[in-house]
């Protein structure tokens, strides 16, 4: 059986004692490569199945103070006024050729009402009422669709209904759904588009900076491995958590930012330290020693950094707002997964690559 305690290849190390706890973790990872790789593969694949649903399942709502008078008043409106609260959906029907109470306008209003009645998330439906939701010339009216579900579910209802409602428009009658639920639905879509666009722009730039920083293409790819592992695991976890408690879409936004930032920082610490240790102790036995030294030094700094971030963010969980708690929770999840990947997956990859970490090095770079 192979010992997990590496011995320095020469007396140049100046270290007479064995590796510390993190150093032993690093050598244990090297001795159990298949197990560690298998666990991470199962984790990423298992959670990755749910990750694509993150933008649809998570909600942009939740900007409220639980227990406040405003939330209590909204709940009373939902209970006693047929769901006619802030999360209700309003459908504006406007006719360019006469009243919405007769002719084609009335037909469209009836179609809007029928479509809303088929959705179980909609409570009481109120057609355009004179003096309230009907203009003086009767050319424009508002169909009120009360909220029959919580705010997050009403955002999903708005997402499902808005295209069907808009499709009821004719050449002379225009149908436009609106309200806070529609606002958050549109925001989620704009947020997804902006996030994808920003990632397409930032990742190539990030890779170029990493290549310059590490001096080699292979070494530059390691932070991206940590980032992807943390992102996929975080996204899948958020979707699963959302089945138990509502999670805001902001959680994924901040999780992505922190996963990228910490993935780069943590990988930079470990890769630079490992390359220095291997340069000081070349040879086959130097791999285990370099991993142990890297984990006992840079690994310790990374662990303390991650724990500090987690402790700092835990205070945000006390804020009585679902959105703020979701943001803190998303960041904490990304930190946990990136930290776990840094302390287990990265040592495995470093030991496996060894000198190949400098492959495709820049001509002017130095290890």
What positions do the PLM features span?
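Solvent-exposed, non-transmembrane loop/terminal regulatory segments of multi-pass membrane proteins
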Residues: 23, 51-90, 94-96, 181
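Sec/Tat-exported extracytoplasmic proteins
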Residues: 81, 85, 116-120, 165, ...
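Residues at beta-strand starts and edge strands
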Residues: 85-87, 139-141, 333
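Extracytoplasmic
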Residues: 71-72, 98-146, 163, 186-189
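Membrane-embedded transmembrane helical bundles of large multi-pass transporters/channels
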Residues: 1-57, 122, 149-367
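Soluble periplasmic/extracytoplasmic beta-strand elements of cell-envelope proteins
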Residues: 88-92, 142-146, 174-176, 269
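Structural beta->alpha junctions
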Residues: 93-104, 145-153, 178-182
